A protein has these predicted regions:
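Carbohydrate-active catalytic/glycan-binding domains of CAZyme proteins
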Residues: 1-355, 359-399
Length: 399
């Protein structure tokens, strides 16, 4: 889980949920979504079921978005042995009715009870896929999603589009939206709209066209934050990263409520707030980093480790105000020779404004405060680079 106040500096809160939290699951913890209701946070997940051998939908609950989460049921929320059951998406309407959608290559749906961990039922008999009529399936049409259901598609025809996976269900104003990965492999993002939670849907076209993202899949999420709209998706462009990495673009809805075309960029979004250097800021609040890794323990929580010479952490839009600070302090732990931390302005080898040495503290989680006077005065807004120096090949300290 990551959080932000400014859209560019993100705080790593660690992993509050693990596949092992679900006794019935043994593999493939894929896409998920979380929602809040009455002070509780519900995390809808998909995973491979040991009970049926297919994919299943589960739900975990916590008192905080940072967890810890626990399996709310001790069993799947929905498990019929099908491999279709992936990528759950959840939305709660103004009247308090919550809805769950999921599926690849078909799109399934259910009404959630107020407890958020059981299905309400009452699904139309023609759409229901279970005897209890708790789960329905959307019938794909060319008008609704650009093509019919996969088993009804004509291989000799070229359709406008086709739903594949990764649904994102939401409402804005009077319109319901279904965003989804489309086109098979490789995937782009398309969407459909309607006036009622279960349709009838109308295909609206692409949002993010097929582009060189370095990933043959895509999966999006949309939110408004501090008066701006953001489109999250994933790429494979992060050098040294494993698999997929999260990206985000700012956008504005068209006047009629439809989406504009949104393109993948290298720059991402602009900051919408500043970072206060006169308050304690966690080392795991980062805009960009090189070399370092975050770790998590019960005693400390999340911290930055695997620090070696030449590594650095960047934070953006740090506002020092009109008067310069006199000193700089960090919390560090060290069980080796230690090293130094240099503070540079605006680039990795920019102006050096502070430097402090970290020495042995007696253990990798024996935390101690280290401080140093500022070498130069600094005012205004800057990007800050924390550059680590020390013996080559040696782990320097934890931060």
């Amino acid at each position: 889980v990551y959080s932000t106040k400014d859209m560019v500096n993100w705080t790593d809160h660690g992993s509050p949920l693990d596949l092992s939290s679900f006794s019935w699951a043994d593999d493939r913890a894929w896409a998920a979504q979380t929602i809040e209701r009455n002070g509780k946070y519900y995390w809808y997940i998909c995973a491979h079921s040991k009970l049926t051998g297919g994919m299943a939908i589960g739900v975990a609950v916590a008192d905080s978005p940072t967890g810890p989460f626990k399996d709310a049921l001790g069993k799947p929320l929905f498990d019929n042995g099908s491999w279709d059951n992936i990528d759950p998406t959840v939305w709660m309407d103004e009247d308090g009715q919550a809805y769950l959608y999921w599926g690849n290559p078909h799109l399934y749906y259910a009404k959630l009870n107020k407890d958020m961990i059981s299905f309400k039922g009452g699904i139309d008999a023609k759409a229901a896929v279970d005897k209890k009529r708790e789960v329905g399936r959307i019938v794909m049409t060319e008008e609704g999603f650009g093509s019919p259901d996969v088993e009804k598609r004509d291989s000799t025809r070229k359709y406008k589009d086709c739903y594949t996976e990764g649904p994102w269900f939401m409402k804005r104003g009077k319109n319901y939206y279904m965003l989804y990965a489309a086109g098979g492999v490789p995937e782009h993002i398309a969407y459909s709209m309607c006036k009622k939670p279960f349709g009838p849907w109308k295909y609206m076209g692409e949002i993010m066209p097929l582009e060189d993202t370095g990933s043959f899949t895509n999966h999006c999420g949309v939110t408004d934050f501090k008066g701006k709209s953001y489109f999250f998706y994933h790429t494979g462009k992060l050098g040294g990263g494993f698999g997929r990495s999260v990206a985000v673009e700012e956008f504005k809805y068209n006047a009629d409520g439809t989406f504009p075309i949104i393109h993948h960029t290298q720059e991402g979004v602009a900051p919408i707030a500043t970072l206060n250097p006169y308050k304690r800021q966690e080392a795991e609040t980062i805009a960009f980093s090189k070399g370092v890794k975050s770790e998590q323990t019960d005693d400390t929580g999340v911290y930055i480790s695997e620090i070696h010479t030449g590594d650095y952490i960047k934070v953006r839009e740090v506002d020092f105000g009109n008067e310069s600070p006199d000193a700089f302090a960090i919390s560090a732990a060290c069980s080796s020779l230690g090293g130094s931390l240099e503070v540079h302005l605006d680039k990795e080898d920019g102006e050096l404004i502070a430097k402090l040495d970290v020495t042995k503290t007696g253990g990798w989680e024996k935390w101690k405060t280290f401080s140093a006077q500022m070498l130069k005065k600094v005012t205004g807004k800057h990007d800050i680079y924390f550059v680590f120096k020390g013996l080559k090949g040696s782990k320097l300290f934890n931060f």
